[in-house]
Design a protein with these regions (language model features):
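Ligand-binding clefts/hinges and TM-proximal coupling segments of bilobed small-molecule sensing domains
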Residues: 28, 41-43, 172-185, 225-226, ...
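A ligand-binding cleft/hinge motif common to bilobed small-molecule-binding domains
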Residues: 103, 119-128, 177-178, 204-236
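Acidic, polar ligand-binding/catalytic clefts
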Residues: 93-156
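Periplasmic-binding protein-like
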Residues: 57, 137-144, 218-258, 277-285
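Bacterial lipoprotein signal-peptidase II cleavage site
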Residues: 17-30
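Extracytoplasmic small-molecule ligand-binding "clamshell" domains
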Residues: 33-115
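Bilobed "Venus flytrap"/periplasmic-binding protein-like clamshell domains
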Residues: 72-86, 119-120, 138-193, 208-215, ...
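Extended ligand-binding regions for polar small-molecule ligands
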Residues: 21, 77, 81, 85-86, ...
Length: 285
């Protein structure tokens, strides 16, 4: 069985939900961006009139481009600016700040309005932070070197004896743990270090979300291949959401913007532009 990267159409989920919703309060659905309680001048922003968005450094393709989130290139940069526009901000009103991935979802006050950084929505993280409605659904992928004995693997069971690694704090790391390999997962500070470990044959394979895996194989790891993809999110679809401070009064307005972008097809268009791949990747089970 194979499937393409565009496996889970979020817009369809939102449209079905909308179709099943009560028909009352239709005025809200046609409200202009940033109107009413979500008008820019009414928003509880970190800096009045300015939308502060966080992400990690470095910021990798295909989520961002040239490690510059402010250029609007890459899926997450484009999504961030689409959300900002939907909320009533001009591009010049957006300011970026750097926040390490594994500290973004820790409890406490945030110095940003929202963070966008392939952060999976989990019950555990929801205890410490808020999440928006999902803007992307992701599969995990296993990357090995072309000459690896695992390059011809066809099932997850084939990796029982493999040493696998992933970035600290990620769903990819939890996905490895779920495979119950003989060796404990190897943990790296970031994806770059994980890729270097694979290049140096210090690990049999690394796990990352599928779009990141495509980038790593194309640009970072010479002589590597994506063996396959698999779903893991504790039994639920893995979805990325914008992260906000716990109980942030901004959350409903961000949700309103993300939902609108899903329903009008913007998220699907951006996914097609920045994440679509012509190559099918086998599904590992």
């Amino acid at each position: 069985m194979k499937r393409t990267l565009l496996a889970v159409p979020l817009a369809l989920l939102f449209s079905v939900a909308a179709a099943c919703s009560p028909a009352e309060d239709t005025d809200d659905s046609t409200a202009a961006p940033g109107s009413g309680k979500c008008a820019v001048e009414e928003l509880p922003l970190k800096t009045p009139g300015q939308l502060t968005i966080a992400t990690d450094d470095p910021a990798f393709d295909p989520w961002f481009s040239d490690n510059d989130p402010s250029n609007g290139k890459g899926f997450e940069s484009a999504v961030a600016y689409a959300v900002a526009k939907q909320m009533g901000f001009d591009k010049d009103d957006v300011v970026w700040t750097k926040v390490p991935f594994n500290t973004s979802y820790q409890p406490g006050e945030k110095e940003f309005d929202f963070d966008i950084n392939q952060i999976s929505i989990t019950k555990e993280r929801r205890q410490a932070v808020d999440f928006s409605e999902p803007y992307y659904s992701a599969a995990q992928a296993i990357i090995v070197l072309d000459d690896s004995k695992f390059a011809d693997a066809t099932s997850l069971a084939d990796f029982k004896s493999a040493s696998l690694g992933a970035q600290i704090g990620t769903t990819s790391l939890k996905a490895i743990e779920s495979l119950e390999t003989e060796d404990a997962p190897l943990v790296y500070d970031d994806t770059t270090k994980a890729a270097l470990a694979l290049t140096n044959k210090q690990v049999d394979g690394i796990v990352a979300d599928l779009p990141t895996a495509f980038y790593l194989v194309a640009a970072e790891i010479e002589g590597a291949t994506i063996v396959g993809q698999f779903d893991y999110a504790g039994g639920e679809p893995e979805q990325f959401g914008l992260l906000l401070q716990k109980d942030s009064p901004l959350t409903p307005c961000v949700n309103e913007a993300v939902t609108a972008l899903a329903e009008n097809g913007t998220l699907a268009d951006l996914e097609q532009q920045w994440l679509a791949e012509s190559q099918d990747v086998p599904v590992l089970k």
